[in-house]
C-alpha cells in the first residue's frame, strides 16, 4: 500500500495521520521523546534536539515545524503529519494523544516534534501527562520558544534594566464566543514586556483591552511574523495604531504580539539593512486603514 502526505515539507515516505506504521515492533513497550523544534530557523535547534531527529525512526510533527527542520530528520524515518492550525486540525488533540500512546504501546520509539518549546503553549504538558498516566516512558527536549527567537532576531530584548523588569507570556487564542479570556489588569501593568502568542485574529481586541485597563494608547507595540525565517517581518507601532498597520500589511499567522517600552529599541537594535515598517500616529493609522 502506498501513502501520500500533503503536509508542507512532507517527504515521500511520510504517512498521513490515522494510518498505522508498517515497521516491525522493536520492543515490548516503546518510548516517546517530546522535542521542541525552536522558532523556525534550523540553526536554532539545540544539539540534543538535532541528535534526536538524526536518530529518529518515527516522527509525529505539527504544522509549525517547517521544511528546513524536517530536513534534519534521519533519512528513511517515518513521518506522520498531525498538523494543528488555528481552528483547523488534521487530528483533534485527543486523537493525537491516542495515536502517540498506540504507537508507543506497539513498541515504537516516537519523536513528537513541536514548534518552539513543547511546554510553552504547545500542549506538550497534556501529551506528556497522558503518557505518564499510560505508563509510557518519555523524555522532554526543550526548544527555543518563539518569543526568544523573535526578540533576538528583530532586535527587541524581552527584558531591559531601563524598561522592563517583568516578562509575561500569554495566549491570545480566541474562545468559542470569540473573546480573549486574559487577566487584563495583570497584562496592563507598567515596566513589563508582554508577548502574546496566537493573537493575530484578536489583535484589535487585545490592543483595546490593554488600553482600557490602563496602558497608554501610545505604548510601543509590535507584531512579528514568521520569526527567524527568511520571510520574517516586524511591524512596530503603538497600541492605538498596530491593528491598522497589521491589516494594511496583511499580517498572517504565525505571528507574535509584543508590547512594552522595549519595542522602541527595535530601530536601534535591528539587523543592518532591515526595512522598518511602522505607524506611530493616528493619522498614519488612518491612512493605512484606508489604503
Locate each region found by the language model.
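Class I S-adenosyl-L-methionine
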Residues: 1-42, 47-144, 242-243
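A contiguous loop/helix-start segment that scaffolds small-molecule binding in enzyme catalytic cores
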Residues: 2-14, 18-19, 29-32, 95, ...
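Hydrophobic packing residues within well-ordered alpha-helices of enzyme cores
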Residues: 69-70, 131, 150, 206, ...
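Generic secondary-structure boundary signal with a strong preference for alpha-helix termini
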Residues: 48-52, 128, 134, 155, ...
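Active-site catalytic pocket residues across diverse enzymes, especially alpha/beta-hydrolases
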Residues: 73, 154, 210, 214
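Surface-exposed loop/turn and secondary-structure junction residues enriched for glycine/proline
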Residues: 42, 47-48, 56, 67, ...
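Class I SAM-dependent methyltransferase SAM-binding "motif I" and its flanking Rossmann-like core
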Residues: 3, 22, 41, 117-190, ...
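Short hydrophobic/aromatic-enriched beta-strand-loop microsegments
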Residues: 77-84, 135-139, 158-165, 214-223
Amino acid at each position: 500500500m502506498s501513502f501520500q502526505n500533503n503536509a508542507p515539507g512532507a517527504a515521500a515516505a511520510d504517512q498521513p495521520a490515522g494510518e498505522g506504521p508498517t515497521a516491525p515492533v522493536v520492543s515490548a513497550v516503546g518510548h516517546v521523546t517530546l522535542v521542541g523544534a525552536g522558532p523556525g530557523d534550523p540553526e536554532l535547534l539545540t544539539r540534543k534536539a538535532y541528535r534526536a531527529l538524526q536518530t529518529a525512526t518515527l516522527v509525529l510533527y505539527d504544522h509549525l515545524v517547517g521544511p528546513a527542520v524536517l530536513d534534519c530528520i534521519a533519512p528513511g524515518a517515518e513521518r506522520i503529519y498531525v498538523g494543528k492550525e488555528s481552528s483547523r486540525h488534521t487530528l483533534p488533540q485527543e486523537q493525537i494523544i491516542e495515536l502517540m500512546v498506540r504507537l508507543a504501546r506497539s513498541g515504537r520509539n516516537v519523536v513528537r516534534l513541536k514548534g518552539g518549546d513543547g511546554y510553552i503553549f504547545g500542549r506538550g504538558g497534556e501529551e506528556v501527562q497522558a503518557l505518564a498516566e499510560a505508563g509510557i516512558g518519555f523524555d522532554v527536549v526543550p526548544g527555543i520558544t518563539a518569543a526568544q527567537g523573535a526578540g533576538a532576531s528583530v532586535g527587541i530584548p524581552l527584558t531591559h534594566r531601563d524598561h522592563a523588569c517583568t516578562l509575561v507570556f500569554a495566549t491570545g487564542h480566541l474562545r468559542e464566543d470569540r473573546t480573549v479570556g486574559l487577566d487584563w489588569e495583570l497584562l496592563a501593568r507598567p515596566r513589563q514586556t508582554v508577548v502574546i502568542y496566537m493573537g493575530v485574529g484578536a489583535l484589535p481586541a487585545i490592543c483595546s483591552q490593554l488600553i482600557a485597563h490602563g496602558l497608554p494608547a501610545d505604548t510601543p507595540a509590535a507584531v512579528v511574523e514568521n520569526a527567524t525565517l527568511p520571510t520574517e517581518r516586524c511591524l512596530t507601532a503603538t497600541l492605538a495604531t498596530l491593528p491598522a498597520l497589521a491589516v494594511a500589511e496583511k499580517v498572517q499567522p504565525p505571528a507574535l504580539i509584543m508590547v512594552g517600552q522595549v519595542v522602541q529599541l527595535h530601530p536601534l537594535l535591528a539587523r543592518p539593512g532591515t526595512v522598518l515598517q511602522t505607524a506611530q500616529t493616528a493619522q498614519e493609522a488612518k491612512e493605512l486603514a484606508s489604503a
